[in-house]
Design a protein with these regions (language model features):
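Short, charged low-complexity linear segments at domain edges
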Residues: 1-24, 76, 257, 262-289, ...
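OB/S1-fold single-stranded nucleic-acid-binding modules
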Residues: 3-4, 8-62
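Short Fe-S-cluster ligation motifs
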Residues: 6, 53-74, 313-329
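FNR/FR-type flavoprotein reductase catalytic core
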Residues: 137-291
Length: 329
């Protein structure tokens, strides 16, 4: 069992206190959980209880919806769609950080909102790039979008990546980024952040199940060379990936970002445990289902030992902790 500080991605931001605080379900504030004493789980420099009181004991206004002009649409065999659209400057600034995502819809019907990670947010041009894998009824409607039309988005949201604290702590070190499939999209802001903090970044990409390399253009922009290799083989870590990780550790890498499905993250953690390298810091994609993004609907919740319910659209976590003690009934 590892010691973990509970953290809320929205604590101390313009969207705090939220509806959870208003209803006594705040992730951080003990008094807004029903206790009669002050014992914040992870203080962010702002008293959430005081903020709620100053706001008339009501939650602050939530995220807004925006109608944005589409600048470019690239369709990759009706499997993946890359969309570039122009957003308000404030929104572009808010979506630069790792883990940023938005809810996208072709129209104003909220039933068709789909959470999509930000691939790039250019604060010079206010152009935001997203990559959408076409899977079901929500994403199929996105195939109809064309340049010079409008797209409805809601945001900003920031909990698309677990282990943000570990990303921010990397300065002047060596990092390894492992990405598979659609995970190349949320990988890009992480790489941008690591490079801005003078890190030496090695990137390995597994295109499976696609044939196109969607990140090639942006990696060239950041002057990063990526090598391609098979990272997963029939649900387990491939021999190639094990060699890549072992060699990276010998070279002094002390941080790994895993951009892919939960099974990929789990396998990397298991392999590091076998190597007795629990000292390696990690970050990974947040693959929990998202619906409202505010911790209200319960789509993102998971149950853990000790009758704990965690809302992962808001709660930041260390990648190792999202599998430890998790219950499936």
């Amino acid at each position: 069992m590892i010691k973990e500080l509970r953290d809320c991605i929205d604590a101390g931001t313009e969207y705090c206190p939220c509806k959870l605080a208003e209803t006594g379900e705040c992730l951080i504030c003990s008094q807004l959980q029903g206790a009669c004493f002050c014992d914040c789980l992870n203080w962010k420099g702002v008293c959430i209880y005081q903020e709620l009181f100053n706001n008339g004991n009501k939650a602050k206004e939530g995220r807004k919806s925006y109608s944005c002009l589409i600048k470019d649409v690239t369709n990759f065999n009706d499997e993946v769609v890359m969309i570039k659209f122009e957003a308000p400057h404030k929104l572009a600034l808010d979506l630069v950080k790792p883990g940023s995502y938005i809810f996208v819809s072709q129209n104003e019907n909220k039933y068709f909102d789909v959470p999509i990670s930000i691939m790039e947010s250019d604060i010079e041009t206010n152009i935001i790039t997203i990559l959408v894998e076409v899977r079901g009824i929500k994403t199929k409607s996105i195939l109809n979008l064309k340049a010079e039309e409008n797209i409805i988005i809601r945001g900003p949201y920031w909990n698309g990546v677990f282990g943000i604290k570990n990303i921010n702590s990397q300065k002047g070190g060596k990092s390894l980024v492992l990405a598979r499939g659609i995970g190349v999209a949320p990988m890009m802001p992480v790489i941008r952040k690591l490079l801005s903090q003078d890190n030496d970044v090695k990137v390995v990409i597994d295109k499976t199940p696609f044939t196109d390399d969607f990140s090639k253009e942006l990696l060239l922009k950041y002057s990063v060379e990526a090598c391609e290799n098979e990272l997963l083989d029939k649900g387990t870590l491939s021999d190639h990936c094990k060699v890549i990780i072992k060699e990276a550790l010998k070279e002094g890498v002390n941080y790994i970002h895993i951009a892919g499905a939960d099974i990929f993250t789990y396998e990397v953690i298991e392999y590091l445990d076998k190597l007795d390298r629990n000292d390696i810091l990690l970050s990974c994609c947040n693959n929990f289902k998202m619906c409202c993004g505010e911790g209200i609907c319960g789509a993102c919740t998971a149950r853990f030992s000790g009758h704990r319910v965690r809302r992962f659209c808001k709660e930041q976590a260390d990648p190792r902790s999202i599998f430890e003690g998790r219950r499936f009934i």
